[in-house]
Amino acid sequence: MGVHECPAWLWLLLSLVSLPLGLPVPGAPPRLVCDSRVLERYLLEAKEAENVTMGCSESCSLNENITVPDTKVNFYAWKRIEVGQQAVEVWQGLALLSEAVLRGQAVLANSSQPFEPLQLHMDKAISGLRSITTLLRALGAQEAISLPDAASAAPLRTITADTFCKLFRVYSNFLRGKLKLYTGEACRRGDR
């Protein structure tokens, strides 16, 4: 079996291993970054974390308010926004969400009785956010931040999370909403 005859699942596996490292996958189809299964993996992990935290009470309190991106999307308005502007909003939201998850991890580390399954999901979320950051770089989202129009962008709308459940709900909704909409459009247009 030659290199070019490898099944698609093998390319997906190689890309998932290489994506967090920012490494290219030799011989992989060039649009693998746009394969919806890659994003679906992170969506599944985020939803799983949200479900785990729904059942816990006091051990899942953050004991502070952490600022997170507002994940509400007006689909009609979103479709009218240029892809570059969408990239700015998604990149800013991802940066804020990454900070929030890291803050949540610090709160958990300082907890006297950490909820063990929560630590696993925090670690997965941090790893997933790093991989998603790499995915957005591959789509050129980071370059949109340096465009002249980025300075005139509307400020990022935010809300606060006071529980791990709300933090993971925001994470899940962000991936399912703005991130999925942006990556879908950027991949369709070929903006990489």
From Swiss-Prot:
PROSITE patterns: EPO_TPO. SUPFAM superfamilies: 4-helical cytokines. Keywords: Disulfide bond, Erythrocyte maturation, Glycoprotein, Hormone, Secreted, Signal. Pfam families: EPO_TPO. The keyword Disulfide bond applies. One of its GO terms (biological process) is positive regulation of cell population proliferation. Disulfide bonds join 34-187, 56-60. One of its GO terms (cellular component) is extracellular space. The keyword Transcription does not apply. Belongs to the EPO/TPO family. This is Erythropoietin. It comes from Macaca mulatta (Rhesus macaque).
